[in-house]
């Protein structure tokens, strides 16, 4: 096994060395990056905090927070499509794509590709359970099995987050918080993300004062001003504070926070912008300003709609508001879009549930 250490933005990751696969087992692939052109070469090693890739004889160590996706030259097309679906929050589609992989397509593939199929299967099963609230035990088994077998995967942080979501769904909030511990040993962006996720556990329990305090702590964490990944996570944490303020009957404070996040976000921060307009819609509903809320949710539906969870939430609220506003045709259109496009989300399940359940 090879011992490696990755360096993030000029600073060494605190004493966190990682064991990776044999250096000789190189797999042709490409790193799709968040804010830079992609990198093609031979993938030498992966770990929770980065990927090492050989580009024409030059080794590059790329930090995990700057990587959007890792693709492999020899992977089946359906495997690639399934991973894209997982990344887009579409686990049902991912499972359909996985089913299209012919057994022969995986014969003789490199170990990283075989491992990737295991990841996509576990992420799809776990993601579907977390989104729908159904088959939680199967989701937990899949995710825990994958993490236990692949503790040095570059997908570790994402899978630990998914594990936390599943445990939260089971009402095991202390275990969910513990599942986020590996992120605390990661780069700053993931430490902020873990802190915000723990705040979310309080939010799920309707402990809004506690949640607001923890979200605020995450948003105020000390990070490098040039660390754009951490900045995005801190803006997301601020939106958590805004949602808590709405739940606590302080919509004006929530609006002020959302306005600040919107001003700090770039036009390409579509996920943050979608979450921000949903939070704005929440604040407007809390203030009794239903028409303003509709405008906020429509902004997510029509403009900042790339993140499925954001758009599903917006559609759910539009159904409720248009039903309330005596616009049955619009409500039905939004209802059908939600049920057809995002049938496995908690928002679709809430919509289909009997009133008062």
Region spans (language model):
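Bacterial N-terminal signal peptides
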Residues: 9-21
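Alpha-helical adaptor scaffolds
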Residues: 126-127, 131, 234-311
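Compositionally biased alpha-helical segments
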Residues: 24-174, 185, 196, 204, ...
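TPR/TPR-like (Sel1-like) alpha-helical repeat modules
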Residues: 295-302, 319, 323-346
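Register position in tetratricopeptide repeats
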Residues: 87, 127, 169, 204-205, ...
């Amino acid at each position: 096994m090879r011992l490696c250490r990755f360096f993030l933005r000029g600073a060494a990751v605190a004493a966190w060395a990682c064991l990776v696969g044999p250096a000789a087992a190189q797999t042709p692939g490409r790193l799709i990056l968040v804010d830079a052109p992609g990198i093609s070469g031979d993938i030498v090693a992966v770990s929770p905090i980065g990927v090492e890739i050989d580009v024409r004889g030059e080794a590059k160590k790329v930090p995990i927070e700057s990587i959007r996706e890792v693709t492999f030259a020899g992977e089946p097309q359906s495997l690639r499509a399934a991973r894209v679906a997982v990344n887009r929050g579409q686990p049902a589609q991912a499972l359909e794509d996985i089913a299209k992989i012919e057994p022969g397509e995986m014969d003789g593939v490199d170990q990283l590709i075989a491992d990737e199929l295991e990841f996509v299967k576990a992420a799809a099963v776990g993601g579907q359970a977390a989104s729908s609230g159904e088959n939680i035990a199967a989701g937990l088994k899949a995710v825990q099995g994958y993490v236990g077998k692949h503790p040095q995967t570059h997908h570790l942080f994402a899978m630990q987050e998914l594990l936390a979501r599943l445990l939260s769904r089971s009402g095991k909030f202390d275990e969910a918080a513990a599942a986020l511990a590996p992120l605390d040993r990661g780069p700053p962006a993931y430490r902020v993300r873990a802190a915000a996720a723990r705040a979310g556990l309080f939010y799920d329990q309707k402990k809004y004062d506690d949640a607001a305090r923890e979200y605020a702590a995450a948003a105020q964490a000390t990070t490098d001003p040039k660390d754009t990944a951490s900045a995005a996570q801190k803006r997301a944490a601020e939106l958590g504070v805004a949602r808590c303020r709405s739940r606590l009957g302080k919509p004006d404070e929530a609006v002020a926070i959302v306005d600040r996040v919107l001003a700090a976000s770039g036009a390409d921060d579509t996920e943050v912008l979608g979450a921000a307009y949903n939070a704005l819609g929440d604040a407007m509903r809390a203030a009794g300003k239903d028409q303003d809320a509709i405008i906020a949710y429509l902004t997510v539906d029509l403009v900042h709609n790339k993140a499925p969870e954001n758009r599903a939430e917006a559609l759910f609220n539009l159904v409720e508001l248009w039903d309330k506003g005596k616009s049955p045709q619009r409500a039905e259109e939004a209802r059908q879009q939600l049920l057809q496009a995002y049938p496995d989300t908690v928002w679709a399940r809430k919509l289909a549930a009997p009133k008062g359940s």
